[in-house]
Amino acid sequence: MNIVVVGLSHKTASVDIREKVAFAPTQMEKPLRALLAIEDIAEAVIVSTCNRVEVYISTRDIAGGMARIKRFLADYHGISPEILEPHLYAHHGEAAIRHVFRVASSLDSMVVGEPQILGQIKTAYGYAAEFKTSGIILNRFLHKAFSVAKRVRTETKIASSAVSVSFAAVELARKIFGNLSDKTVMLIGAGEMCELAAKHFINNGVRGVMVTNRTYERAVKLAEEFEGKPVSFDDLFDQLHKADIVLSSTGATQFIIKPKDVEEVIRRRKLKPMFFIDIAVPRDIDPKVNDVENVYLYDMDDLQGVVASNLQQRAEEAKKAEAIIDEEIGQFHKWLSNLEVTPTIVALRSKFEETRKAELEKTLASWKDLPPDGAKRLEALTTAIVNKLLHPPTATLKRVGQGGRTDLYVDALRTLFELQTGESEAEELGELEE
Amino acid sequence: MNALFFKLTLAIYFAATIAYLAYLVKPREVLGKVSCWILSAGFVAHCAYTVDRYLEAGHTPITNLHESLSFFSLAVVGIYILFERKYRIFILGSFVTPVAFLLMAASTGFPSAIMPLNPALKSKWLMVHTVMAFLSYAAFSVAFGAAIMYLIQQHFLKSKKLGPMYQKLPSLDILDEINYRCLTIGFPLLTFAIISGAIWAESAWGTYWSWDPKETWSLITWFVYAALLHGRLTTGWRGKKAAILAIVGFFVLLFTFLGVNLFLSGLHSYK
């Protein structure tokens, strides 16, 4: 049995293609059942997010399986195969395992280390489990992918740092203030970036919001949105000491906040720290403000510098993650191969055993002057012959099972000895292995 | 028996220091917990050593430099473990544990034989005065560790060069709070130690205060910390200023403890 992955992602397809191929997350039953109805597809899982659409199947026929998924994707969404084909990637065997482990660990994501993808795959797997389109192989495979992703998360620092400007600002605030729940944010100006950053702060537990703007109406409107307090622009320096975090993005052409103002404000605050974030270009806050004691000023470039160094750190952590994945692929591949090899060995052994027993019985039934311990001796002799003969092929199969090219040997043996090729044994075995 | 406990403590503190430094390099929760357990085991061994010595000598074992350094170290570890339980900041241990280990190691450099007590030291005040003094020293040592961490973290935030160390260090707020907590524990203890010392001096030598070098330096130390506490409570000194003063205070304290003993002669100089 093989694992085959066919799909497309932000790396291979533009958003207009991805949109067309996406599956509605609430209506997974129909496509999953349709996939399972296709011949030679034993199990199926569909992962569909805004950045990727992937189909995982288990099948005996690798090439056929790939072609059938491709056709299914085109037919299901009514896109001509010629248009879709160039955007699709297809993996099987070890490459498929590596691919899914990397996706689940967020190494293949647009922002490496972003945590959402794991949840999305879990949801996708949830549908497959609900509609019973995944079986022992994909079950085991995806559970393994989840545990690999968890290992990557706990053993590397791949997701430990903020990679967007807004999150970097929140992270910095945490390093300054610790808990944000009793902190107040002041928004100066009402730019879009400022709003976004303010939202991040609110989502991260900031208590109070104050908004000021040159046009007071705009401040009132925005303050309502955040359930905050509007402050008239003229009162800015009267109110500033109440803010712990100041987000500024006005269209002013000159500095509106100078070191002298901040020194005064910080004195009124009894030296309680302040964090200024200047998102405006040109800047609103004099860079010298950073020199005031207990005041921290970050402008857009500073924040982007933080993000860049975090991204670089993630890239370094990604290398460690790849090493973890390498390790885990080996283990899973071994299981998959054994899954293939073991039933064949079992079938081969039982075939030999049945033949031996049948022939022995025939002989014993017709042998009149058998010595008293003759039956016992013949039993031992025939068993020994069978075991001796079966030893080399069993050992060889176990060995290739760990290397690759398993199918070749398994198919040859099954044909040569006319072994049963039922799924039931494999399933039983799989359950035992679970 | 006594020597065994001592060696055991020294060995475990060494292991704890290594473990905490490893935590500094690779801050894993498990490593932090293991470090804390090792240190706690060392603390138990250290208590055993101290109690054993107390029983053998028949008085609180803080009468020579060997014993004092050992007791200082014990107090540092004890106070640190309390902070560890409250704040769960293992990285603080990376800064404090080496101090405890060094104090313990330094104590090996001084004669450890139990000597008969000088008559003036034979007093119930010996225990009260010295234990208070060393507990306050320990609190100030933890404050020293937190202050150094504060300055490092603040440097990262101000300079905007956020290295890997920045990720590992706790927030400025927590470090400042630890600094303050230590002060509120250490200062009353120091005050009480000085007062009990004065009472003892009166009963031993008939005078509360004789401007002996140790007394003078104790007063200086007290003033430094009093200024820090006053600044914090009234003008809101915090952050960098508080951290620097905690560091200055610690060096004054070290001089009061060691410098006076080693370089200046007086009633407190252990022979």
Curated annotation (Swiss-Prot), chain A:
Site residues (Important for activity), renumbered to this chain: 99
Q: In which pathway does it act?
A: Porphyrin-containing compound metabolism; protoporphyrin-IX biosynthesis; 5-aminolevulinate from L-glutamyl-tRNA(Glu): step 1/2
Q: Name the top EC class.
A: oxidoreductase
> What start and end residues bound the annotated signal peptide?
none
Q: Which reaction does it catalyse?
A: (S)-4-amino-5-oxopentanoate + tRNA(Glu) + NADP(+) = L-glutamyl-tRNA(Glu) + NADPH + H(+)
The record's listing under InterPro entries reads: 4pyrrol_synth_GluRdtase, 4pyrrol_synth_GluRdtase_dimer, 4pyrrol_synth_GluRdtase_N, GluRdtase_CS, GluRdtase_dimer_dom_sf, GluRdtase_N_sf, NAD(P)-bd_dom_sf, Shikm_DH/Glu-tRNA_Rdtase
Q: Name one Pfam family in it.
A: GlutR_N
| Any one GO MF annotation of this record | NADP binding
Query: What's any GO biological process attached to this entry?
Result: protoporphyrinogen IX biosynthetic process from glutamate
Q: What is its EC number?
A: 1.2.1.70
Active site, UniProt feature: 50
Q: Does the keyword NADP apply?
A: yes
Record-annotated residues binding NADP(+)? 189-194
Recite the UniProt keywords alphabetically: NADP, Oxidoreductase, Porphyrin biosynthesis
Key word GTP-binding present in the record?
A: no
Q: Where on this chain does substrate bind?
A: 49-52, 109, 114-116, 120
Instruction: Kindly give any further remark recorded in the entry.
Output: During catalysis, the active site Cys acts as a nucleophile attacking the alpha-carbonyl group of tRNA-bound glutamate with the formation of a thioester intermediate between enzyme and glutamate, and the concomitant release of tRNA(Glu). The thioester intermediate is finally reduced by direct hydride transfer from NADPH, to form the product GSA.
- What family name appears in the similarity comment? Belongs to the glutamyl-tRNA reductase family.
PANTHER family cross-referenced by the UniProt entry: GLUTAMYL-TRNA REDUCTASE
Q: What is known of its domains?
A: Possesses an unusual extended V-shaped dimeric structure with each monomer consisting of three distinct domains arranged along a curved 'spinal' alpha-helix. The N-terminal catalytic domain specifically recognizes the glutamate moiety of the substrate. The second domain is the NADPH-binding domain, and the third C-terminal domain is responsible for dimerization.
Subunit structure of this chain's protein: Homodimer.
The record's function comment reads: Catalyzes the NADPH-dependent reduction of glutamyl-tRNA(Glu) to glutamate 1-semialdehyde (GSA).
How is this protein named in the record? Glutamyl-tRNA reductase
Q: Which organism is it from?
A: Geobacter metallireducens (strain ATCC 53774 / DSM 7210 / GS-15)
Q: Give the gene symbol.
A: hemA
